[in-house]
């Protein structure tokens, strides 16, 4: 299992691409996680292709971003950041916002 003391890692090239294309970064995601802006964590729905991978559902300015990740012994590796209109709708309905 992982703890809040574990460090986060990611691909720096992917981070730069996300900043340019989606106006979001792994640093922003980590900030929001540290602030408790986490709706839920789920197993990746396609465990055949992504075994052991999980997904953070992170709340950023009222919008849900899906952040697939892998837990290693020493760190959590963040794979990408995906804005999700469907998850945002589900979150809003569930929380009455």
Model-found features: residue ranges?
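Ribonuclease/tRNase effector modules and their secretory precursors
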Residues: 1-97
